Amino acid sequence: MAIQQPEQYYGTGRRKAAVARVFLRPGEGKIVVNGKEFQTYFRGLLRAVNALQGFRETGTAGRFDAVITVTGGGPSGQADAIKLGIARALLKVNPDFRAQMKPKGLLTRDPREVERKKYGLKKARRAPQFSKR
């Protein structure tokens, strides 16, 4: 009996406060984010174009439909979360893609988060103005 290929591949991406759940299915390259088309959802955000870098690096652009749900954060963080989610999902399609994506940093989770505000300060590090007299 032949091994069945799964018809859906899943990857999770996170960046700042944004979390993206990416589902890849074989198709003609249609990308839907939260029920809207990719271009409509990001409306010309230049950083959003980089979210699809994983498809370009692996030569799989146009071979998969992506259904993405993304929550939290702003447009930039969401775009980066989608980029990581797509890269992780593509790894499940073919583990050999790691050699193409790893040098480009597509599989690296950016650990930078917002630093918390401390009491006695105006922001995380900004102290109140100092007066000598």
From Swiss-Prot:
Residues 107-118 have a biased composition (Basic and acidic residues). PROSITE patterns: RIBOSOMAL_S9. One of its GO terms (molecular function) is RNA binding. Keywords: Ribonucleoprotein, Ribosomal protein. InterPro entries: Ribosomal_Su5_D2-typ_SF, Ribosomal_uS9, Ribosomal_uS9_bac/plastid, Ribosomal_uS9_CS, Ribsml_uS5_D2-typ_fold_subgr. Disulfide bonds: none annotated. Residues 119-133 have a biased composition (Basic residues). The keyword Transferase does not apply. GO terms for cellular component: cytosolic small ribosomal subunit. It comes from the Bacteria. One of its GO terms (biological process) is translation. Gene3D superfamilies: 3.30.230.10. Pfam families: Ribosomal_S9. Residues 101-133 are annotated as: Disordered. Belongs to the universal ribosomal protein uS9 family. This is Small ribosomal subunit protein uS9. The lineage of its organism: Bacteria, Thermotogati, Deinococcota, Deinococci, Deinococcales.
